[in-house]
Amino acid sequence: MCQIGIRLFNWYEPPCVTVSQNLTRNPIRFYSRRSFIISKEEKPKLCHSKLFPTKMVMKTNGFVDGSLPDELKKVLRLVGSEWGDVVDDMESLQVIPLKGAMTNEVFQINWPTKCGNLDRKVLLRIYGEGVEAFFNRDDEIRTFECMSKHGQGPRLLGRFADGRVEEFIHARTLSAADLRDYEISALVAAKMREFHNLEMPGPRTVLLWNRMRDWLAEAKSMCPARCVKEFRFDSLEDEISMLEKELSHDYLDIGFCHNDLQYGNIMLDEKTRSITLIDYEYASFNPVAYDLANHFCEMVANYHSETPHILDYSKYPGLEERRRFVATYLSSAG
């Protein structure tokens, strides 16, 4: 039975507005009161550079002044109606860009309730274009829906072709320094154990090695020959095979891993001291030891510095810190 996380909120939440799996580029078509698809003419694009290869370029400048696309307005009206709100006056909406997302663009959208207070909040996520090189968007959507149903992460409120509307989590995103805080680190360790024990659909097949090969092939296809030689891409193929052979054992504990537990994907409710893991683009079955090790590696990064692409390995956790984290993980009920 799936281990269900503790909900951060206990107020009424509307049912999810589902969408047809056939995400075509046609104009909005209603299949039922809660089933619709939306098209979007302009999509964000992915730029590449030698130093920071995944910088997003978005085309949603109109969101800032409140001029939302008509298709999105229809989604918000439908989501609002589930709360008993009437979202007709789009001029009353507050649209606030949120920073920190790497493969999407996210906005906080507020609208007044019947009492006239701006206290209804949702999160709008616009998918980035070109990220299919790194993960499968359909798999990510299915994972998000499953997590939402099991009380993990934000609740899914609505979907459209190039994005979705999510529950707004009233918690703060961690900072790079937070990962080194003893109390917060212990909370993260316990939450990881719970996450790994989730009973998720699909075969428990390790994705790590094939994903690395796919990423390597993608990197080779977009880099000039001199870069392939300079960065020794060919030797990386041999290294992946060597690691797979050395680290693939029957005794390894395979669980559903987040695979991207950097500080920006971890939220903390200061009142309840509850941890929420968000953004499941890379989530899959893998050895749980890999997810732990990857989290340690993320401690050397600061994506909000002037040089987000430079990793400071002097900040890698020492042996005692790693032992403490693993001990907390193992002692947690999950």
Features from the language model and the residues they span:
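Regulatory N- and C-terminal appendages and interdomain linkers associated
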Residues: 2-95
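Active-site activation/catalytic loop segments of kinase-like enzymes and analogous catalytic loops
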Residues: 290-334
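An alpha-helical support segment within catalytic cores of ATP-dependent transferases
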Residues: 68-89, 93-94, 98, 200-259, ...
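ATP-binding pocket architecture of kinase catalytic cores
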Residues: 96-235, 246-253
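Catalytic activation segment of kinase domains across protein kinase-like and atypical kinase folds
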Residues: 267-303
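Acidic, Ser/Thr-rich intrinsically disordered and amphipathic helical segments
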Residues: 67, 71-74, 106, 142, ...
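Generic alpha-helical structural context detector
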Residues: 77, 190-193, 217, 294-297, ...
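Short histidine/acidic/glycine/proline-rich micro-motifs that form metal-
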Residues: 63, 128-132, 282
